[in-house]
Design a protein with these regions (language model features):
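Extended C-terminal regions of large enzymes
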Residues: 1-298
Length: 298
């Protein structure tokens, strides 16, 4: 809520988070939506009359929190914004789609992906959209284990491995802040699983389970009509370079994204449209879902 809305008053930001929690809304999404509304207001796409008298300028903490309430109660422009920035942009129009910061309809979390190429791929292929909890691939960029400004084929395998591990951590209901303490990590996770359930489990079996979950999620998205075209990034991330700072000039080109998508699909054993083939489904015990991908990869 702070940077997205230009609000530097910590009390206003804390109040906004409290409101979101109390009113049953995600604080990340609501911060992006309010920031989107502020940009619409400053560009003349939303009027003061539509806001119910609120002056939605960037930096206006009181207006930010008042709008959060309106969104929860679907009052004035809040009725449109309550649908999220993707649908709101479709309704507001006027080019607002270009600054609606979402992936697959889910508002982006707080990472500047224009200067984090591994993270950019992780977000693009995320089954939920703009959710850092599906991959955590920004860690490679931030730790300097890769050149964060460079798109390379090897990023595909990195993101795949992160996703599969996160599937296991979610299945264990383990906080991902502990992801670095598990030895192996699958060796220790498999040992814990066996000790708790009494069911023998090897590290390889545990790893394969994570892969199975990732592939099943992909199948469900394909069933719902998602394609390679949905594995993309917000317009701003791909067309507007970072204006200042150490990452000045960075953004993700379509060619860079395509290179990393191809590498990711290849690492997954999918075809170039991101569709798992029958051989992969058989390997993972998912042939019951073969009808979803008929005509896809072999």
């Amino acid at each position: 809520m702070g940077p997205n809305c230009g609000v530097d008053d910590p009390n206003a930001v804390i109040k906004g988070i409290e409101l979101a929690n109390t009113l049953g809304m995600d604080a990340i999404s609501i911060g992006v939506v309010v920031g989107f509304a502020m940009e619409c207001y400053e560009k003349g796409l939303i009027t003061k009359e539509q806001t119910g008298g609120l002056e939605l300028n960037f930096g206006n903490g009181s207006a930010m929190n008042a709008l959060i309430k309106k969104i929860a109660l679907r009052e004035d422009i809040g009725d449109v914004l309550a649908e999220g920035c993707k649908i709101a942009a479709e309704k507001i129009g006027g080019g607002s789609e270009k600054f609606a910061n979402h992936i697959k309809g889910l508002e982006m979390t707080g990472y500047e992906i224009r200067g984090l190429k591994t993270a950019a791929l992780g977000y693009a292929v995320s089954r939920r959209g703009g959710d850092h909890q599906r991959h955590g691939s920004y860690s490679h960029d931030l730790k300097g284990t890769v050149d964060r400004y460079k798109a390379e084929p090897g990023r595909g395998a990195l993101v795949m491995n992160d996703e599969d591990l996160y599937c296991i951590l979610d299945s264990f209901i383990i906080c991902k802040f502990t992801r670095g303490v598990w030895q192996g990590p699958y060796e220790e996770l498999a040992e814990v699983y066996s000790l708790v359930t009494g069911i023998p489990m090897t590290a390889d079996q545990m790893k394969k389970t994570g892969e199975r979950i990732s592939n099943l999620a992909r199948l469900l998205n394909i069933r719902e009509g998602l394609t390679r075209a949905d594995d993309t990034l917000p317009y701003r991330a791909m067309h507007e370079p970072i204006p200042a700072g150490v990452s000045k000039g960075s953004y993700v080109t379509q060619a860079e994204l395509d290179l990393m998508l191809d590498a990711y699909y290849e690492a997954r054993g999918w075809d170039n449209q991101g569709v798992p083939g029958l051989a992969k489904l058989e390997e993972l015990g998912l042939l019951d879902y073969a009808s979803i991908v008929e005509g896809g990869a072999a």
